[in-house]
Each structure stands twice: as structure tokens, then as C-alpha cells.
Amino acid sequence: MKLSVCASALNIGKAPAPFMDAVASHGFSGIEFWGWWNYDTNEIKDAATRNGQTVTAICTRFIPLTDPARREEYIAGLRETIPVARSLGCKTIISQLGNDTGDTRARQHQSIVDGLREAAPLLEDAGMTLVIEPLNWRDHPGYYLRSADEGFAIVREVASHAVRLLFDIYHQQITEGDILARILPNISLIGHFHAAGVPGRHELTTGELDYARIIEAIDGAGYNGWFGLEYFPTGDAVSSLDELRAYLTARGVRGE
């Protein structure tokens, strides 16, 4: 499984380049970030080039698609993000969908589908994939998309290879559970994964989830994308990555 380190979580509030150098020296070649506008993207590009790293994902602007009145603003944010992603050699753009507006869920759902259908040609032309992200109800009260099942339905309705789901195992374990029962039948609709220990959003080696089994099953289902490590370490971040690799290796699961 190709492991991608989320620098915005494991190295929160710090300059990216030294962290990128450190994780690269420990054999981790995938790196991702949240809001690119909070970083010197030239610094990220230089570090990735120096280390032979792939920038696996960045976020687009956080503009709600639940509100059709803001769709033009969302598309403008995506138009701004695509060239940044291209400059970083990044093929995946993460999109949150916004809070519940109070309108009916049917109308908000349709607004999201319509907005993503408008966005799809931009992504197809750029050779990039947008991944939409459900979030859990506890950490993100008011957020519209909680259910992976609704997320998969949206992806099917948009009907573009350039729009997929970001399946965040941490969020979905809190919201609905049945992790592999939701992932495996829908593996072709998933463009990226995020993972953290539950509860606490700390290391994958802690908590109630058997991540070695989960990763093995995802790999066995034919997924060939990146598996994002998006957790808040309780100790040294790089040491925690080494511990994760040792845990996976001990269980016979390869992480690279």
C-alpha cells in the first residue's frame, strides 16, 4: 500500500520542508497538505523534487456546494487550485462540500451534484481527480455530508471519472462503522483514503480499528491509489511513522 503522510496534521503549524526531508529520509515518498494557500508552495515543490516525493493531494477552497448561490465561487476556487496542483505534480484535489443550509436534504444533494457536474470538465481537462469528503457529526457539527453511502450516490450521479470519494476511515467509523462492508463494494468509487486511530484521532496503532486488516483488504480489492495518514501524533511524528511501518510489517502488510 502506498502511504501518504498528511503534513498538515502530523506537522501542524510548522514549515513543511524540514518535515518533508525527515519523512523522506525514513522512506515515505507520499506527502499531502490541506489548504495550499497557507503554505509557500514553491518551498513544497522544491522539497518534493529534492526528495523524490509525490504531492498526493491538496484541498480546494472551502466554498459550500450545498448552496447553489455560491456555486460560481466554488468553481472559481477550483480554477485557482488546479494550476497550483499542476505546479506541484499533484493529481488529487480534496473538496469538502459545506454545512447544511437548512434547506431540504434533497435540494442540497441536488445542488452538490449539479455543482460537481459543472466542475467535472475542468478536472477531466486537467487530468485530475476531485475527491469529496464526508466528515463525522461529532467533530464537525452542521456539516452536510456525513454518510459514505450518500457520498457514493453523489459520485454515481455525477458520472465522471474525475469525481470520486475520499473515504476517511476515522470519520466513517465514528459516523456509521461497518468500514470494510462500505469500502469493498464501492472500491472503484474511492479516489483517496484518510486514516487515524479511533477514538482520539491519534496513531493508527492505537484504538479500536485493526488497520493492518483494513489495509490488507483494501489492497486485496485492487485499490492502487494513496492511503493518507492524517492523524495527530501523541509523540514524535517521524517516530510514529516508523512504528506504524513496523506494526504493518509484523502483520505481514507492506507499507511504502
Residue positions per predicted region:
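Generic structural signal for hydrophobic
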Residues: 22-23, 48, 81, 85, ...
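Active-site acidic/histidine proton-transfer and metal-coordination neighborhood
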Residues: 50, 65-164, 174, 255
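Histidine-acidic metal/acid-base catalytic patches
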Residues: 1-27, 89-91, 114, 145-167, ...
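Conserved beta-strand positions in the central sheet of alpha/beta enzyme cores
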Residues: 32, 57-59, 94, 131, ...
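N-terminal substrate-binding region of glycoside hydrolase catalytic domains
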Residues: 20-35, 59-63
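Active-site-adjacent beta->alpha loops and helix N-cap segments on the catalytic face
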Residues: 37-49, 103-104
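Active-site-proximal loop/turn and secondary-structure-junction residues that shape catalytic pockets
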Residues: 9-11, 35-37, 60-64, 98-101, ...
